[in-house]
Amino acid sequence: LYPFYAKGLADGSLKQESARELLQCFWVKFNNQPAPPKVGVTAEESGTYTDFALINVGGLKADGGDGVNPLSFLILDVIEEMRILQPSSMVQISSKNPDPFLWRALRIVKTGFGQPSIFNTDAILQEFLRAGKSLADARGGGASGCVEISAFGKESCILTGYMNWPKILEVALHEPDRAAVGLGWPQ
């Protein structure tokens, strides 16, 4: 989003207040879009259920540099001004980010609104690398949904957390016969 913001300001097609208003309109529009009904959930029951979209602000750029920019601060302003539940927001804090960015986010957290959540980008990066992700994918990832971390554009987080309890019981009872429960042979 930042390249469009910077270009608009540079060529005069966008003013700071217009950018703020566009972001506020996005927040309102997003908040008015309930999630589609889930399996076994009617449209009426789903009317106030959201898809847990999460706006990531801050963190690192693809080259490993500080990912905070003027738009990051504007988004924090909008989060504080709008105080609506969707989209959820989070800040990625890295040792490379400027202290005023962290302090600005903490001033919003202090209000008790519950947003933005705060994630340690450096720890997320280490976890991604430990899990075998490339450095580029690790830098380009973050949190999605509630708190799941993923490499954006490379993988998906399942938010439902459904458990197949009958399958677990079947595996527990028939572990010696792995083929009978569709597991094949141990590798």
Q: What residues fall within each predicted segment?
A:
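Conserved catalytic cores of very large enzyme subunits
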Residues: L1-Q187
